[in-house]
Amino acid sequence: YFKMFEERWSEHVRKLKAGEIKPGSEALVKIGILRQCSSYFKINKTLEIVENLLNDGQSVVVFCEFLDTINELEKIFNSKKISCEKIVGSTPKDERTNIVERFQNKKFKVFLGSVKAGGVGLTLTAATHLILHDRPWTPGDAEQAEDRCHRIGQSSTVNVYWPQLGEIDEIVDTVLDSKSENIDVVLKNKNVSFVANNLVELQKEIVKYYEDEYGI
């Protein structure tokens, strides 16, 4: 996990020095890379859930935050002869409509989508199982993604799965469950807590913890 982080962080620093990208909030960049690494290492868990559901004859929707994860899942599904199609930011509007229609008509079993591109405005009621491989930071985005299977015409209970890997996912879950503008996160099994007035402040606190604890 941390080896992957170091590789991706080194690549970010290289691009920064080469002028390929503009300087920004390094704390937010680090938290993004930590989440990308977490996303990658949850792939096997999501694959296990999908295969179990397919064995039961179910269709399933999988939403991810990161394009690399979507592409890796698509590659794995194709190698296992699992029928799947995806909608991401670059998918043309007409193609999106066709993909949704094919999924609704059960032409394929696994719908892959990015939270931003596939999590809004689509009707995916052919599935009663939805995997949020990566939970977005904001409750609104998470709810929009879940609502794709809860649309009008859905008469069955929808099951939502949230694969979780370690501290970073635990923190995101706590933020989503928080009902207050002030965020208070306590890590299980560790005497560590974060208190922040907003999400950006929280992210900086998290990065400081990872820097002190793991030397990233």
Which residues does each predicted region cover?
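A short beta-strand element within the Helicase C-terminal
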Residues: 122-135, 158-162
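Interdomain linker/hinge connecting the two RecA-like lobes of the SF2 helicase core
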Residues: 1-59, 65-68, 72-75, 179-213
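Hydrophobic, well-ordered secondary-structure elements that form the walls
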Residues: 62, 84, 112, 124, ...
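Short alpha-helical
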Residues: 41, 67-69, 94, 119, ...
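A conserved SF2-helicase RecA2
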Residues: 136-216
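Alpha-helical elements of the RecA-like P-loop NTPase motor core of helicases
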Residues: 44, 71, 75, 97, ...
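Conserved helicase ATPase core of P-loop NTP-dependent helicases/translocases
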Residues: 59-63, 71-74, 78-118, 141
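Conserved beta-strand segments of the P-loop GTPase G domain that flank and frequently precede/overlap
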Residues: 63, 113-114, 132-134, 162-164
